[in-house]
């Protein structure tokens, strides 16, 4: 046991051989199938966007740590993971300079300003996407497939034109408009299986999050429960972003509460918000509640007497 490191999880503690760099390497491997399908559907431009985002994140982290005389951490691959996740949340037509700005913002403002890996209070890639949505809404919501501008399934559901939805089989394999890494649900499920196999994450947050969205969207009268699950970036957000170690709860009970909150907010934003998608802001809001959730769900120490009024 390394007594020089602070353990942030609740007891009991299980020690494993997985280091941060190994975990991030497996996350990159799990993300790879979605990236391959993004290039398959959108062409080499998708690969270029990925390279720009990853390079912007890695180089900005390197430059910041050099300027501030801090230990270099680009070898832990966390900046590369942030860059790839950001790229997956962007349309393939995004100007490359915007993608680079989003990567720099995610690393410098959201991650490094708060102390680096594990200290950020929200997911850096999602915060970068939120900043880009606020700054360049048109560029961030222009979708193409086979070079033709098209509406996303979520936009069709919100408009009530369910008869124009693509077949569910198309939505499962990704043949629809959307961000370059979010459309192929089969590829994302392969990544989910890899993360479960390596015990990088548990099933609780992704499954509860996705099912909550489907159930609540049905109760809210949207009329397409399966399409609501398969449309947009819900799978990408639930599997890879809502499960971020630094910004998600540490207990199973906390994960359940957190996942339900993410799902409820996503359903509310999709139904009544001005933007058809909702997972970005839902996860960011729930990230801010994680300290409260952890405090409320942390297991009581054996023999501890609960103080009056607490």
Predicted features and spans:
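Hydrophobic alpha-helical transmembrane segments in multi-pass integral membrane proteins
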Residues: 92, 138-144, 220-224, 264-279
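Long hydrophobic alpha-helical segments that form multi-pass transmembrane helix bundles
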Residues: 118-189
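Structural signature of hydrophobic alpha-helical transmembrane segments
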Residues: 43-56, 93-102, 171, 175-185, ...
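Membrane-interface helix-loop-helix junctions at boundaries between adjacent transmembrane segments
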Residues: 78-79, 84-147
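C-terminal ends of transmembrane helices
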Residues: 11, 59-71, 107-118, 188-199, ...
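Loop-to-transmembrane alpha-helix initiation sites
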Residues: 121, 125, 226-234, 255-257, ...
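N-terminal signal-anchor module of multipass membrane proteins
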Residues: 1-54, 58, 303, 309
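Alpha-helical transmembrane segments in multi-pass membrane proteins
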Residues: 26-34, 49-61, 78-83, 87, ...
